[in-house]
Design a protein with these regions (language model features):
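N-terminal secretory targeting modules
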Residues: 1-42, 46-54, 62-71, 102-105, ...
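Alpha-helical cap/lid subdomain in secreted, periplasmic
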Residues: 2-3, 93-232
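Low-complexity, intrinsically disordered short peptide segments enriched in small/polar/basic residues
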Residues: 6-8, 34, 71, 76, ...
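Short, mixed-charge, low-aromatic patches
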Residues: 13-25, 48-58, 86-94, 134-137, ...
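Conserved SGNH/GDSL esterase-like catalytic core that processes O-acyl groups on lipids
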Residues: 36-40, 46-131
Length: 232
């Protein structure tokens, strides 16, 4: 009995650690109220909030919700390890979360994705990425798209060339950011250049060189907030 209880506590404690540090993969979407402006934050682990302490409060969509207040409803549709490209190992469009983000009928879609596309096993090339990015964005219909470039990726002490942690290729990340800028101009989307901002603020990115820190998540939320307030 004691052994079973101890095991349960261990498992429960382990899950709690994963949950509160943004590693459980659990969703935190809720229902919007009538009259609220709906904001769907779509993306990968950057949007989800991977590795951020006290994740339920400190992922960037949660911070954005607090900044915007009751007149807005923000849902986090970020899913770690997923990618734009349909040929990748984990295409975002194959997810139930993707279908849920469509059904949410958002007024604004804040889209930030591409880090996992940069992995050697996923990267097919600029044309394929551009085509699949356009397909994804167009699937949101009449929603206003706020298109964010992905955060800059940095080499670390353990990863000094070609590929950094999580198999991310910083040079390909730079290329993906440029493609995203071009797509925003082509489609007339609102652009937030998170890639350029994070390049100037290494402290916005955690020690792994890839994921935003708590400070970085707050900075991203502030940038999105500034745009939404200007729009409304």
């Amino acid at each position: 009995m004691v052994l079973v209880l101890s095991f349960a506590i261990l498992i429960g404690g382990g899950f709690a650690y994963l949950y509160f540090n943004g590693m459980s993969g659990m969703s935190n979407t809720t229902e919007a109220k009538d009259g609220q402006i709906r904001i769907a934050c779509v993306g990968d682990s950057t949007t989800y909030g991977h590795g951020i302490s006290n994740w339920p409060k400190n992922n960037y969509p949660a911070i954005l919700q607090n900044l915007l207040g009751e007149g807005y409803h923000v849902n986090n549709y970020g899913v770690s390890s997923h990618a734009v490209q349909d040929t990748s190992d984990r295409p975002y469009m194959n997810l139930e979360h993707y279908q849920e983000s469509l059904a949410y009928d958002a007024d604004y879609v804040v889209f930030m994705m591409g880090s996992n596309d940069s992995k050697p096993e996923n990267w097919v090339g600029a044309d394929a990425f551009r085509e699949d990015l356009l397909t994804l964005l167009e699937s949101y219909g009449d929603a206003e798209i706020i298109l964010c470039t992905l955060p800059s990726a940095f080499f670390t002490d353990e990863h000094t060339e070609n590929v950094t942690s999580h198999d991310i290729q910083p040079l390909i990340v730079d290329e993906i950011a440029q493609i995203t800028r071009e797509v925003a101009a082509e489609k007339g989307c609102i652009l937030i250049d998170i890639h350029a901002l994070t390049a100037q603020h290494r402290e916005w990115i955690s020690a792994d060189g890839v994921h935003p820190s708590k400070v970085g998540a707050a900075a991203i939320a502030q940038e999105v907030y500034n745009i939404l307030i200007k729009e409304n």
